[in-house]
Design a protein with these regions (language model features):
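Amphipathic alpha-helical repeat scaffolds of TPR domains
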Residues: 1, 21-41, 48-60, 109-110
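Alpha-helical adaptor scaffolds
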Residues: 1-13, 18
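Alpha-solenoid helical repeat scaffolds
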Residues: 6, 22-26, 95-98
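Alpha-solenoid repeat scaffolds
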Residues: 17-18, 34-39, 87, 91
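Active-site acidic short loop of glycosyltransferases
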Residues: 18, 146-148
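N-proximal helix/coil linker or "cap" segments that precede and/or mark the start of modular domains
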Residues: 60-146
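Conserved redox-active cysteine motifs that mediate thiol-disulfide chemistry
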Residues: 146, 154-158
Length: 158
């Protein structure tokens, strides 16, 4: 919501310490990433499906994201995640609620996977190299199939 975004902006500028600032930057990065994802999603929905989101989140929220530029939101999210990695990577990001600690790792450990996903695992990006053995025992590399449509099916029995 705009109110939450305003609060995060205040926390980032308030000089309340690296922990508060870093957590606020990370929260804003996650917010922008979510907004970019929803902005893309909302532009593809039928009016009936869109109405479900309007009922859940409010028509103003849906309209704001429909009008938003998802590319700009994604670029801002990437910048914010990178800032967390560059400036707050070592800050403890564990969450303490009612005297119990929920281990979440450092802020850098929380931001790095999102940054990796945005830079390497998004639509239009070249997939990372995969080397494995197929079901027939033959070694293969994903790059052997470059230029071809490939479906990867990961499964296992744990």
């Amino acid at each position: 919501s705009p109110s939450m975004e305003k609060l995060l902006g205040i926390l980032i500028k308030a000089e309340l310490g690296r922990g508060v600032e870093g957590a606020a930057v990370l929260a804003l990065a996650k917010t922008r990433k979510g907004q970019a994802d929803r902005a893309n999603q909302f532009k593809q929905l039928t009016p009936e499906r869109l109405e479900l989101y309007e009922n859940a989140y409010g028509a103003d929220y849906v309209a704001r994201l429909q009008a938003a530029d998802a590319t700009t939101l994604l670029a801002e999210a990437e910048q914010l995640f990178q800032r967390v990695v560059d400036e707050f990577a070592d800050v403890n990001g564990d969450l303490v609620l009612n005297g119990r600690t929920l281990p979440r790792g450092t802020l850098g450990e929380q931001a790095a996977p999102a940054l990796f996903e945005m830079n390497n695992l998004s639509v239009g990006k070249v997939a990372p190299e995969i080397a494995a053995e197929d079901i027939g025992g033959v070694d293969f590399k994903l790059s052997d199939y470059r230029g071809k449509v490939v479906m990867l099916d990961f499964w296992g029995h744990w």
